[in-house]
C-alpha cells in the first residue's frame, strides 16, 4: 500500500477572546474584503474553538491556529504560536 500525501493544513491568525475553558480558547479571526457592488472595505469576523494544551494564553493575545482532526464537537483547530 502506498501512503497518500496529506494536503497542507490551513493556518489562521487571530485574537483570543475567551479562555474560560480548560485547554480550550476561542479565537476571533477577522478578514477584510471589498464589497462587490460598492467597493467599500468591509471587515467580517468568525470565532474558532482551538485546543491549547498549555493553558497559558490570556484574552487579547495574538495567536496562530492550525487545522487538525476533530478533537470534540466544536474543536477542529489547535494553537501553534
Curated annotation (Swiss-Prot):
InterPro entries: NA-bd_OB-fold, Ribosomal_uS17, Ribosomal_uS17_bact/chlr, Ribosomal_uS17_CS. One of its GO terms (biological process) is translation. The keyword Ribosomal protein applies. Gene3D superfamilies: Nucleic acid-binding proteins (2.40.50.140). CDD domains: Ribosomal_uS17. It comes from the Bacteria. Keywords: Ribonucleoprotein, Ribosomal protein, RNA-binding, rRNA-binding. GO terms for molecular function: rRNA binding; structural constituent of ribosome. The keyword Transmembrane helix does not apply. Pfam families: Ribosomal_S17. One of its GO terms (cellular component) is cytosolic small ribosomal subunit. SUPFAM superfamilies: Nucleic acid-binding proteins. Disulfide bonds: none annotated. Belongs to the universal ribosomal protein uS17 family. HAMAP family: Ribosomal_uS17_B (MF_01345_B). NCBIfam families: PRK05610.1 (NF004123), uS17_bact (TIGR03635). Part of the 30S ribosomal subunit. One of the primary rRNA binding proteins, it binds specifically to the 5'-end of 16S ribosomal RNA. This is Small ribosomal subunit protein uS17. It comes from Protochlamydia amoebophila (strain UWE25). The lineage of its organism: Bacteria, Pseudomonadati, Chlamydiota, Chlamydiia, Parachlamydiales.
Amino acid at each position: 500500500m502506498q501512503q497518500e500525501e496529506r494536503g497542507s493544513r490551513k493556518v489562521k491568525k487571530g485574537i483570543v477572546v475567551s479562555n474560560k475553558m480548560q485547554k480550550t480558547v476561542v479565537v476571533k479571526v477577522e478578514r477584510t474584503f471589498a464589497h462587490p457592488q460598492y467597493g467599500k472595505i468591509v471587515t467580517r469576523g468568525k470565532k474558532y474553538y482551538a485546543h491549547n494544551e498549555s493553558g497559558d494564553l490570556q484574552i487579547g493575545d495574538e495567536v496562530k491556529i492550525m487545522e487538525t482532526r476533530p478533537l470534540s464537537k466544536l474543536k477542529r483547530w489547535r494553537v501553534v504560536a
